[in-house]
Amino acid sequence: MTQAAPETLPLPPSSTEAIQRFCDALWLEDGLARNTLDAYRRDLTLYAQWLAGRGKALDQTEDVDLSDYFAARHEDSLASTANRRRTVFKRFFQWALREHLVSADPTRLLSTAKQPPRVPKTLSEAQVEALIAAPDVDAPLGLRDRAMIELMYASGLRVSEIVALKTVEVGLNEGVVRVIGGKGGKDRLVPFGAEAGDWLRRYLRDGRTALLGERTADALFVTARGDGMTRQAFWYLIKRYAQRADIHAPLSPHTLRHAFATHLLNHGADLRVVQMLLGHADISTTQIYTHVARERLRTLHAQHHPRG
């Protein structure tokens, strides 16, 4: 005999409406992905249901309610999960304050839970080479994809930066790209190597012109319709080529950026140089990659040292 699920208290209409309006605003203003919006809605709904047990709606939240809620959820939450909820609640109540749904922000005293630094997943150099070689360069789209992957691995650009690149921002003769308005609104110059430069030239000569036909575009990397690439499209390509290259390692949209940083450090690059290339404001962000490099060195030592 199965046990009945505990009864869930119905949400006050004002809470349901506020959550929906907030998610609509995020979709319109920030263009957040559906999965992200669903996670935000789920976190807020769970809290609103818990709060309904106290006879309150979301707009009646007080500091003590949030403190009690996080204390109640502490035992079943990772620090990263708790921090995500804090971020969601802060955004929601800051929005609610702007919309005059609340008179004060009850999240102002919420502290961040400590969590260990997340070591980014990366690929070996052999795996990157296999990924780079996966596109069919006899086709215009394959040329585009090869040039994109070459450039990302050669420069460490963020996905959002590489899809936003304009043709005029690439200096082929100088071997640099100019990133306009990167993370934090900062511009920077990032070098790339001769191999990436050769593939960019080939793409511009044979691939981009074939994709555009009689059309014109500012974007460096274009689709078959002549539009600029999107982050989602690039991520789809990386997953497809990883499958073609028989790569089963965990991937993310920034896999090549992580590989760029880790492989530079493995080959003795200075941490400050890598920080500048990645566009990190704080070197502690870059230091995460040293954990990957150290683990790789330990593995090599264990495999190849006679007393490993």
UniProtKB/Swiss-Prot annotation:
<dbReference type="GO" id="GO:0005737">
    <property type="term" value="C:cytoplasm"/>
</dbReference>
<comment type="subunit">
    <text>Forms a cyclic heterotetrameric complex composed of two molecules of XerC and two molecules of XerD.</text>
</comment>
<keyword id="KW-0131">Cell cycle</keyword>
<dbReference type="GO" id="GO:0009037">
    <property type="term" value="F:tyrosine-based site-specific recombinase activity"/>
</dbReference>
<comment type="similarity">
    <text>Belongs to the 'phage' integrase family. XerD subfamily.</text>
</comment>
<dbReference type="GO" id="GO:0003677">
    <property type="term" value="F:DNA binding"/>
</dbReference>
<feature type="active site">
    <location>
        <position position="257"/>
    </location>
</feature>
<dbReference type="InterPro" id="IPR011932">
    <property type="entry name" value="Recomb_XerD"/>
</dbReference>
<dbReference type="GO" id="GO:0051301">
    <property type="term" value="P:cell division"/>
</dbReference>
<keyword id="KW-0233">DNA recombination</keyword>
<feature type="domain" description="Tyr recombinase">
    <location>
        <begin position="118"/>
        <end position="302"/>
    </location>
</feature>
<protein>
    <recommendedName>
        <fullName>Tyrosine recombinase XerD</fullName>
    </recommendedName>
</protein>
<dbReference type="InterPro" id="IPR002104">
    <property type="entry name" value="Integrase_catalytic"/>
</dbReference>
<dbReference type="InterPro" id="IPR004107">
    <property type="entry name" value="Integrase_SAM-like_N"/>
</dbReference>
<dbReference type="Pfam" id="PF02899">
    <property type="entry name" value="Phage_int_SAM_1"/>
</dbReference>
<dbReference type="InterPro" id="IPR050090">
    <property type="entry name" value="Tyrosine_recombinase_XerCD"/>
</dbReference>
<feature type="active site">
    <location>
        <position position="254"/>
    </location>
</feature>
<keyword id="KW-0132">Cell division</keyword>
<feature type="active site">
    <location>
        <position position="280"/>
    </location>
</feature>
<dbReference type="InterPro" id="IPR044068">
    <property type="entry name" value="CB"/>
</dbReference>
<dbReference type="Pfam" id="PF00589">
    <property type="entry name" value="Phage_integrase"/>
</dbReference>
<comment type="function">
    <text>Site-specific tyrosine recombinase, which acts by catalyzing the cutting and rejoining of the recombining DNA molecules. The XerC-XerD complex is essential to convert dimers of the bacterial chromosome into monomers to permit their segregation at cell division. It also contributes to the segregational stability of plasmids.</text>
</comment>
<dbReference type="GO" id="GO:0007059">
    <property type="term" value="P:chromosome segregation"/>
</dbReference>
<keyword id="KW-0229">DNA integration</keyword>
<keyword id="KW-0238">DNA-binding</keyword>
<keyword id="KW-0963">Cytoplasm</keyword>
<feature type="active site" description="O-(3'-phospho-DNA)-tyrosine intermediate">
    <location>
        <position position="289"/>
    </location>
</feature>
<feature type="domain" description="Core-binding (CB)">
    <location>
        <begin position="13"/>
        <end position="97"/>
    </location>
</feature>
<dbReference type="GO" id="GO:0006313">
    <property type="term" value="P:DNA transposition"/>
</dbReference>
<feature type="active site">
    <location>
        <position position="183"/>
    </location>
</feature>
<dbReference type="InterPro" id="IPR013762">
    <property type="entry name" value="Integrase-like_cat_sf"/>
</dbReference>
<keyword id="KW-0159">Chromosome partition</keyword>
<dbReference type="InterPro" id="IPR023009">
    <property type="entry name" value="Tyrosine_recombinase_XerC/XerD"/>
</dbReference>
<dbReference type="InterPro" id="IPR010998">
    <property type="entry name" value="Integrase_recombinase_N"/>
</dbReference>
<dbReference type="InterPro" id="IPR011010">
    <property type="entry name" value="DNA_brk_join_enz"/>
</dbReference>
<feature type="active site">
    <location>
        <position position="158"/>
    </location>
</feature>
